Amino acid sequence: MVHQYQLNGYNIVLDTCSGSVHVVDEVAYDVIAMYPEHTADEIVAAMLAKYGSRPDVTEEDLRQCIDDVTSLKENGKLWSPDVYKDMAFDFKNRNTVVKALCLHVAHSCNLSCSYCFASQGRYHGDRALMSFEVGKRAMDFLIENSGTRRNLEVDFFGGEPLMNFDMVKKLVAYCREQEKIHNKNFRFTMTTNGVLIDDDVIDFCNKECHNVVLSLDGRKEVNDRFRVDCAGNGSYDRIVPKFQEFVKKRGDKNYYMRGTYTHYNTDFTNDIFHMADLGFTELSMEPVVCDPSDPSALTEADLPILKEQYEILAKEMIKRDREGRGFTFYHYMIDLTGGPCIYKRISDCGSGTEYMAVTPWGDLYPCHQFVGDPKYLLGDIWKGVTNTAVRDEFKHCNAYARKECQDCWAKLYCSGGCAANSYHATGSITGVYEYGCELFKKRMECAIMIKVAENQELAAKGIEVPIELGSTCNACADGEACE
C-alpha cells in the first residue's frame, strides 16, 4: 500500500509496509500515482500532455522514471507486500505479562475541570484515597505477573495524586526495596494538575520519577475556562510559576506539559506556542474526550480547522528549530530510521493485558478510561484477572482487528488506535472512531514531513539517513524483557 500527499512544498510517498519514505518531484509523484493501474505507454502519454512544455521532461526521462519506480517495487520499497497480519494475532495469543499499572492513588481532586472524563476525579463513584496496603499489594501484583520483564512502569494518577503524596512516597520506598529482591527496575510517572507542587514534591519527583506530566491547557483564558477550582477560580496563575520552577530544577529529565483542546480553542496551536514561549519544551495537546452533546465537544465543522492547525504547528516547529528555539510535540515524535519493532507496531498499547488501571479499592480495569464501568471490571489485585473474557477481547485489539484498518495507510503507526476512544464513540472497543482516525492521520503526515525536512537538511550537509520500518527484535514474541 502506498500513500501520497503534498505538504510544505514536499511531494511525499510513503510505502506502508516497508516504512520507506520517498521525496520526489511533481513528475515522479504523478507517475507513481498512475503506476498501479496504467501501462508505461499510458503514463508517458499522460505525463507528456501535462508536462510536455517543459524541456526537462522528455519521453526518455519519463521511461527512466517508470523503470526507477519498477525497481523500487521489486526491491520492496513501493507496494511492498503486507506480511504482518498473521504476526498480529500470533503475538496476541502468547502468554502475556503485566508491564505497567496506572495507579489511581486518589479518586479526588482539588480542581473541578468541566470536561473531565473522570467526573472531577471521582470516576462517577465515591471520593477515595488509596491506602498503603492496597498500593503495596498492587506493586506485588505487578511483580508477580511481570514474568522476566525487568522494567516496570507505574503512573501515579487520579484525580490528583498529590492529594495522597505521603502514601506515594512510602510506596516508592517499598518498590525500591523490591527492586533488589526481584531484579526489577521501577519507572514512575507522576501526573499532576500542579496545585500542590512545592519544593518537597519537586525534589521527590526529580529523584524518583522517570517522567512527570504537568497539566496546562495553554493560554490563561483557555486554561481558566475549564481548569478551575471548586469555587470556579481559574488555576493558571497558581500553577504556571510552579511548573516553571519544577521544569527548571528538573534539568534534562523527562517531563511533558499536557493540554486538552476543545471546540472553544480550535486554534490550539496558539496554546502550544504559548507554552513554548513560557519556556516549556516538551509539549503535548490532546483532543477532548467527552459526550458529543457537551458544548466543548469537537464537531465535524471543526475537523478541517484542526487539520490545518496541525500543519501550522509542523511548519512552525521547523522554523523554530532552525532558529534555535525548538520544542518537542509528543504526537510528532516518530523514529523513521528504526523505531519500535514490528510487534509493537502491530499490537495496541497493551490495555487490558499488559497495562491495567488499579482503583483505590484494588479493582482492575483495562485502563483509566474504563474505570467505573462494571462491564470492563477485570478482577482485582488479590485474585488477579478473573474476567478473562474481557482480557481476551482486549488481546485481539491490534492493527488488523478492524476491517477498516486493514486498508489504512496509517495502521502501522496507530496500531489500531485507542480502544477506549473506539468504545466511547461506537460502543465497541473494536469499533472505529473515525474522527480520531482523521486527526491521527493528519498528525502522522505532519510528523513524517518534519522528518523529511530534517533529512533534507542533513542531506544538504552530505549526511544520508535511511528511512525504513522498525525491525523485529523477537524479544516480545519470545516473552523476554524489552524496553
Placement of each model-derived feature along the sequence:
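Acidic, low-complexity/disordered tracts enriched in E/D and polar residues
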Residues: 1-35
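Short acidic, hydrophobic short linear motifs in intrinsically disordered regions
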Residues: 38-51
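Conserved alpha-helical substructure of the radical SAM core
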Residues: 56-203, 207-208
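Radical SAM enzyme [4Fe-4S]-AdoMet core and its adjacent flexible, acidic
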Residues: 63, 221-237, 244, 248-352, ...
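Local cysteine-cluster metal-coordination motifs and their immediate loop/turn environment
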Residues: 108-118, 366-369, 403-420, 474-481
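Radical SAM/AdoMet-radical enzyme domain recognition
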Residues: 135, 139-155, 164-288
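Short Fe-S-cluster ligation motifs
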Residues: 139-157, 394-396, 432-476
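C-terminal accessory region of radical SAM enzymes
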Residues: 305-338, 368-415
